[in-house]
Amino acid sequence: MHRCFSKKAHSLFIKAEVDYRKALEINPKSTDAMFNLGNSLLMQQKAKEAMEQFESASKVEKDKDKLAQIYHNMGVILQSSKQYPQCIEAYKESLRNNPKDDETRYNLALAQKLLKDQQQNLS
């Protein structure tokens, strides 16, 4: 059952990717389409492409709540690739836009601990 769900979910993320790319062809400045395309790419383990979409959206988005979500997702990608200093900055930027986001605050604390552990293991 789980495997079947996984295949179904994956096909939905592929369809979403196609649809959001079409939306961006119609309106290349749509930060909602960039963000949602980034999310669909992320769910397909296409982190590099997802990051490109989030970076593009972060340059034009004005809404603080949406910016917080964008930077949060950038932090998640950077954390998963162990780029802790950049990850920490992304989470801090997310919190500047939405200081009440407990999930981002937790992720920031975790990333700071992981960076400290990484630095201790190198010395």
Predicted regions and their residues:
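Short, mixed-charge, low-aromatic patches
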Residues: K7-S11, P28-T31, A47-K48, D63-D65
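Intrinsic disorder/low-complexity signal
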Residues: A16-V18, T31, K116
